[in-house]
Protein backbone atom coordinates (compact mmCIF):
# COMPACT_ATOMS: atom_id res chain seq x y z
CA UNK A 1 0.00 0.00 0.00
CA UNK A 2 1.05 3.60 -0.50
CA UNK A 3 0.87 4.21 3.24
CA UNK A 4 3.26 1.36 4.00
CA UNK A 5 5.63 2.42 1.20
CA UNK A 6 5.72 5.96 2.64
CA UNK A 7 6.76 4.53 6.02
CA UNK A 8 9.41 2.30 4.43
CA UNK A 9 10.88 5.40 2.77
CA UNK A 10 11.03 7.10 6.17
CA UNK A 11 12.81 4.01 7.54
CA UNK A 12 15.27 4.08 4.63
CA UNK A 13 16.11 7.72 5.31
CA UNK A 14 16.59 6.88 8.99
CA UNK A 15 19.18 4.25 8.03
CA UNK A 16 21.07 6.60 5.71
CA UNK A 17 23.25 7.69 8.61
CA UNK A 18 25.51 9.99 6.58
CA UNK A 19 22.58 11.40 4.57
CA UNK A 20 24.14 10.80 1.14
CA UNK A 21 21.07 9.14 -0.43
CA UNK A 22 22.47 5.58 -0.47
CA UNK A 23 22.85 2.99 2.26
CA UNK A 24 26.33 1.50 2.21
CA UNK A 25 29.06 0.11 4.47
CA UNK A 26 29.88 3.73 5.39
CA UNK A 27 26.49 3.97 7.12
CA UNK A 28 27.23 0.77 9.04
CA UNK A 29 30.65 2.03 10.14
CA UNK A 30 29.32 5.42 11.20
CA UNK A 31 26.40 3.99 13.18
CA UNK A 32 28.57 1.37 14.92
CA UNK A 33 31.28 3.87 15.81
CA UNK A 34 28.87 6.53 17.03
CA UNK A 35 26.95 4.01 19.10
CA UNK A 36 30.02 2.53 20.82
CA UNK A 37 31.50 6.02 21.36
CA UNK A 38 28.29 7.45 22.84
CA UNK A 39 27.98 4.50 25.22
CA UNK A 40 31.71 4.64 25.94
CA UNK A 41 31.98 0.95 25.15
CA UNK A 42 35.49 -0.49 25.03
CA UNK A 43 37.21 -3.82 24.52
CA UNK A 44 35.10 -6.95 24.16
CA UNK A 45 31.84 -5.04 24.78
CA UNK A 46 32.62 -2.65 21.91
CA UNK A 47 33.68 -5.48 19.60
CA UNK A 48 30.58 -7.52 20.44
CA UNK A 49 28.24 -4.62 19.72
CA UNK A 50 30.00 -3.86 16.43
CA UNK A 51 29.78 -7.51 15.32
CA UNK A 52 26.09 -7.70 16.28
CA UNK A 53 25.28 -4.46 14.47
CA UNK A 54 27.10 -5.66 11.34
CA UNK A 55 25.13 -8.91 11.44
CA UNK A 56 21.86 -6.95 11.72
CA UNK A 57 22.70 -4.70 8.75
CA UNK A 58 23.74 -7.69 6.60
CA UNK A 59 20.72 -9.81 7.55
CA UNK A 60 17.91 -7.27 7.36
CA UNK A 61 19.06 -4.28 5.34
CA UNK A 62 21.59 -5.23 2.66
CA UNK A 63 20.54 -8.86 2.08
CA UNK A 64 23.89 -9.14 0.26
CA UNK A 65 26.65 -8.35 2.78
CA UNK A 66 28.79 -5.37 1.82
CA UNK A 67 26.44 -4.20 -0.94
CA UNK A 68 24.94 -0.75 -1.36
CA UNK A 69 21.21 -0.31 -1.50
CA UNK A 70 19.16 2.51 -2.97
CA UNK A 71 15.82 3.66 -1.62
CA UNK A 72 14.09 2.08 -4.62
CA UNK A 73 15.79 -1.28 -4.02
CA UNK A 74 15.04 -1.12 -0.29
CA UNK A 75 11.35 -0.40 -0.85
CA UNK A 76 11.12 -3.06 -3.59
CA UNK A 77 12.76 -5.66 -1.33
CA UNK A 78 10.33 -4.92 1.49
CA UNK A 79 7.38 -4.81 -0.91
CA UNK A 80 8.28 -8.14 -2.51
CA UNK A 81 8.79 -9.74 0.87
CA UNK A 82 5.52 -8.28 2.17
CA UNK A 83 3.50 -9.48 -0.85
CA UNK A 84 4.89 -12.98 -1.29
CA UNK A 85 5.63 -13.99 2.23
CA UNK A 86 3.22 -14.10 5.12
CA UNK A 87 6.33 -14.51 7.28
CA UNK A 88 7.07 -10.79 6.70
CA UNK A 89 5.76 -9.94 10.17
CA UNK A 90 7.95 -12.65 11.73
CA UNK A 91 10.98 -11.39 9.77
CA UNK A 92 10.42 -7.79 10.88
CA UNK A 93 9.86 -8.97 14.46
CA UNK A 94 13.23 -10.77 14.37
CA UNK A 95 14.81 -7.69 12.76
CA UNK A 96 13.75 -5.29 15.51
CA UNK A 97 14.26 -7.79 18.33
CA UNK A 98 17.85 -8.17 17.16
CA UNK A 99 18.77 -4.48 16.81
CA UNK A 100 17.09 -3.43 20.05
CA UNK A 101 18.82 -6.25 21.90
CA UNK A 102 22.08 -4.63 20.74
CA UNK A 103 20.88 -1.13 21.67
CA UNK A 104 19.87 -2.26 25.18
CA UNK A 105 23.52 -2.30 26.27
CA UNK A 106 22.80 -2.78 29.97
CA UNK A 107 20.40 -5.67 29.17
CA UNK A 108 17.72 -4.46 31.61
CA UNK A 109 15.01 -5.01 28.93
CA UNK A 110 14.01 -1.35 29.06
CA UNK A 111 15.13 1.76 27.26
CA UNK A 112 15.73 5.00 29.11
CA UNK A 113 15.87 8.43 27.54
CA UNK A 114 19.67 8.43 27.21
CA UNK A 115 19.73 5.02 25.51
CA UNK A 116 17.02 6.27 23.15
CA UNK A 117 18.94 9.47 22.36
CA UNK A 118 22.17 7.51 21.79
CA UNK A 119 20.44 5.00 19.51
CA UNK A 120 18.96 7.76 17.35
CA UNK A 121 22.25 9.70 17.33
CA UNK A 122 24.10 6.56 16.20
CA UNK A 123 21.80 6.51 13.16
CA UNK A 124 22.47 10.17 12.37
CA UNK A 125 19.49 11.75 14.13
CA UNK A 126 21.06 14.54 16.13
CA UNK A 127 17.91 16.65 16.72
CA UNK A 128 17.50 15.87 20.39
CA UNK A 129 14.18 17.69 20.79
CA UNK A 130 12.59 15.46 18.13
CA UNK A 131 14.09 12.36 19.76
CA UNK A 132 12.75 13.47 23.17
CA UNK A 133 9.31 13.95 21.60
CA UNK A 134 9.50 10.45 20.12
CA UNK A 135 10.43 9.03 23.52
CA UNK A 136 7.50 10.84 25.17
CA UNK A 137 5.13 9.33 22.57
CA UNK A 138 6.13 5.89 23.90
CA UNK A 139 4.71 6.89 27.31
CA UNK A 140 7.65 6.24 29.66
CA UNK A 141 6.85 4.95 33.15
CA UNK A 142 7.57 6.67 36.48
CA UNK A 143 11.24 5.66 36.20
CA UNK A 144 11.36 7.39 32.79
CA UNK A 145 11.93 4.10 30.98
CA UNK A 146 9.99 2.27 28.31
CA UNK A 147 9.86 -1.52 28.19
CA UNK A 148 12.01 -2.81 25.36
CA UNK A 149 9.00 -4.76 24.07
CA UNK A 150 7.02 -1.50 23.66
CA UNK A 151 9.79 0.05 21.57
CA UNK A 152 10.21 -3.08 19.45
CA UNK A 153 6.45 -3.39 18.91
CA UNK A 154 6.24 0.27 17.84
CA UNK A 155 8.92 -0.30 15.17
CA UNK A 156 7.30 -3.54 14.00
CA UNK A 157 3.99 -1.72 13.61
CA UNK A 158 5.76 1.10 11.77
CA UNK A 159 7.08 -1.21 9.05
CA UNK A 160 4.16 -3.67 8.84
CA UNK A 161 0.87 -1.89 9.61
CA UNK A 162 -1.11 -0.80 6.55
CA UNK A 163 -3.90 0.90 8.51
CA UNK A 164 -3.40 4.67 8.26
CA UNK A 165 -6.19 5.24 10.81
CA UNK A 166 -4.08 3.68 13.59
CA UNK A 167 -1.71 5.90 15.55
CA UNK A 168 1.88 5.23 14.51
CA UNK A 169 4.30 6.45 17.17
CA UNK A 170 7.44 6.04 15.05
CA UNK A 171 5.94 7.77 11.99
CA UNK A 172 4.72 10.60 14.24
CA UNK A 173 8.18 10.93 15.75
CA UNK A 174 9.90 11.21 12.36
CA UNK A 175 7.35 13.75 11.18
CA UNK A 176 7.56 15.95 14.29
UniProtKB/Swiss-Prot annotation:
From which domain of life does this come? Eukaryota
Q: Further notes on this entry?
A: The sarcoplasmic calcium-binding proteins are abundant in the muscle of arthropods, mollusks, annelids, and protochordates.
Entry function = Like parvalbumins, SCPs seem to be more abundant in fast contracting muscles, but no functional relationship can be established from this distribution.
Entry protein name: Sarcoplasmic calcium-binding protein
List positions binding Ca(2+): 104, 106, 108, 110, 115
Nucleus in keyword set: no
Q: Which GO terms describe its molecular function?
A: calcium ion binding
What PROSITE patterns does the database record attribute to this sequence?
EF_HAND_1, EF_HAND_2
The EF-hand domain extends over 3-38, 55-90, 91-126, 127-160
Binding, Ca(2+) 1: 16, 18, 20, 27
| SUPFAM superfamilies named among the record's database cross-references | EF-hand
Q: Which InterPro entries does the UniProt record give?
A: EF-hand-dom_pair, EF_Hand_1_Ca_BS, EF_hand_dom
- Keyword Cytoplasm: yes or no? no
Amino acid sequence: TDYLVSKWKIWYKSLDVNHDGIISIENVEESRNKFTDLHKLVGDKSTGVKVDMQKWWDTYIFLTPGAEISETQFVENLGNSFKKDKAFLATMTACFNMIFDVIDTDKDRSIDLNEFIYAFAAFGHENESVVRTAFALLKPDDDNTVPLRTVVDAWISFVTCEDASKTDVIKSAFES
